[in-house]
């Protein structure tokens, strides 16, 4: 069983879900855990609500393949919490997706975490540790890179909320991956996903060595070739590879009670 813990729905006409599913089938992915972001950030209430509707529709259209994360902007506090609860109760979404709308240690995130704990729902957080010279280049895309959460902050968050399960997103797409891995060594409830375009030699091996394979989940962030190459090319045991590719995420899905 191969589970992609970090995938996205994007926007037509450049993205076709049917076409994307064909490619994921060719790569052998059994289940996709997807979220949809808004075209511009920070997102507003109508934006993230519409994005979640699209995810819910995809789940309904492809119930055997697609599971959904609820994406919200925590800055909208009450409305964000209401939307997250709706996604959990009405659509049985697997968890919460947080992006760059605010940093993960913002107090407004705490009620969302408490709700996630209630439903045993994992929390996937966009993560990066960027060198200063890259910040300006990323400005047009991220809107405000100063609100990007770091692995160190996620580790801190995990210690504050020991009953929650956090996933630090795309270790291969967040800048200094070695720093990120080291920051997640201590808390047992903070995992990382392997997504991103980075395929640096030794990245996956270091993650397994420092964190243990049980704290790593496979993610592509829709970058399929690089996503698989770094896992199959890594010098790790077959047992650890199986855990990363799907075993660990299946445990989270079973704990949540999603198909």
What function would you assign to each model-found segment?
Residues 1-13, 52, 56-70, 185-188:
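Mobile, glycine- and charge-enriched loop segments
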Residues 2-5, 33-36, 69-71, 97, ...:
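Active-site neighborhood of phospho(di)ester-bond hydrolases with catalytic His/Asp-centered motifs
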Residues 7, 12, 19-42, 66-73, ...:
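Divalent metal-dependent hydrolysis catalytic cores, especially in the metallo-beta-lactamase
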Residues 10-13, 39-42, 74-78, 103-104, ...:
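Active-site environment of divalent metal-dependent phosphoester hydrolases
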Residues 1-8, 16-31, 85, 206, ...:
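Mid-to-C-terminal alpha-helical segments outside catalytic/metal-binding sites
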Residues 94-95, 109-215:
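Catalytic pocket-lining loop regions of alpha/beta-barrel enzymes
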Residues 46-134:
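Active-site gating/metal-coordination segments in enzymes
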Residues 6, 24, 55, 59, ...:
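Conserved, mostly hydrophobic/aromatic
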